[in-house]
Design a protein with these regions (language model features):
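Hydrophobic alpha-helical context, especially transmembrane and signal-peptide helices
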Residues: 14-16, 30
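Acidic/His-rich segments in extracytoplasmic proteins that coordinate ligands and/or metal ions
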Residues: 94-102
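Bacterial N-terminal signal peptides that target proteins for export
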Residues: 2-13
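C-terminal motif of bacterial Sec signal peptides marking the signal peptidase cleavage site
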Residues: 18-23
């Protein structure tokens, strides 16, 4: 399902950027058909922006852009139900890759942007920074933390309400497996969960004492409603930003974002090839439209090289 609130936020910028693309000649004219995309709610704004921009050049290509979560997206992708899969983590070598192989789904991984998983609080929470250890203590599977003072006696005596992604989300996987490092690869379960980051934004913004986490994009769209916490991983408090994510300073919460493309669909279906080519050829503009963290020059060159190899 598309996010109408996101569409309202980016449409003016998309129209302006699309005009620039059209003036330069995007080469996306002529093809028609449908493209099925699903997966990460974090990557959704990026792929949706690509579709909005492509529509300005070729309205005959129609796309469905879903938000089933990274794991849910890979389940559909490896079953051959979708052409592209948005992911906020690499495909799992032990569980998901064998399913793709079993079903004859050959694919290409494209690194499309960088994200900073952002820990936010309701503005009424007088806390500015958490250590990685405090973040783990808050979200680990057996956590009993329910008051801010449980993390630090100097924090406010205020009850904590928690909001976070559901278990199908790559954002959840990243927090559970990479940040917390729990053997069970789970977090605590007593929180309000949603695969839609907009629901999490509304929950934290509307609940005193609340905190949650999601991709940087959704925080940047809602800075008037939320406060982002800096994270101290041992070298002082570092705020989430484009610069700190690209430089690697914002650890352990920065991460790469991917789009996986079904190679057969790319070769056999004109609409899929046109969409994918447009996506990569205009990646910098699309990232700007969706307000993601762009790839470094080296990363962008690697992605373009990988894309060129798909036509070989």
């Amino acid at each position: 399902m598309k996010s109408s609130s996101f569409r309202r936020a980016i449409v003016p910028g998309v129209i302006a950027l699309a005009a620039a693309l059209t003036a330069c000649g995007g080469g996306a004219e002529g093809a028609s058909g449908t493209v099925a995309i699903d997966g990460s709610s974090t990557v959704f704004p990026l792929s949706n922006a690509a579709y909005e921009l492509l529509q300005e050049e070729n309205p005959d290509i129609k796309a469905t852009v879903g938000q089933a979560g990274t794991s849910g997206g890979f389940e559909k992708f490896c079953a051959g139900e979708t052409d592209l899969s948005d992911a906020s983590r690499p495909i799992d070598e032990e569980e998901e890759v064998p399913v793709c192989k079993k079903n004859g789904v050959d694919y290409t991984e494209l690194h499309v942007a960088t994200d900073a998983l952002t820990v936010v609080v309701n503005p009424d929470v007088d806390v500015d920074c958490l250590t990685t250890e405090q973040l783990i203590k808050l979200w680990e599977p057996k956590s009993k933390v329910d008051n801010w003072q449980d993390l630090d006696p100097s924090f406010p005596d205020k009850e904590i309400s928690l909001f976070g992604p559901g278990t199908d989300s790559g954002t959840y996987d990243y927090m559970a497996g990479d940040v917390i490092g729990a053997e069970s690869e789970t977090t605590r379960t007593d929180y309000e969960a949603s695969e839609d980051d907009n629901v999490l934004v509304q929950g934290v913004a509307g609940t005193p004492g609340a905190t949650g986490y999601f991709g940087y994009t959704y925080y940047e769209e809602n800075t008037d409603k939320l406060k982002a916490l800096a994270i101290d991983d041992g070298n002082g408090c570092v705020e989430p930003s484009v610069d700190t994510a690209q430089s690697g300073e914002y650890t352990p919460l920065s991460r790469p974002l991917f789009v996986y493309v079904n190679n057969k669909a790319y070769k056999d279906t004109a609409a899929v090839k046109t969409f994918t080519d447009f996506y990569v050829d205009n990646l910098e503009t699309i990232v700007e439209a969706a307000k993601f963290i762009p790839l470094s020059d080296e990363q962008l060159a690697e992605t373009k090289d990988t894309h060129e190899g798909m036509s070989g």
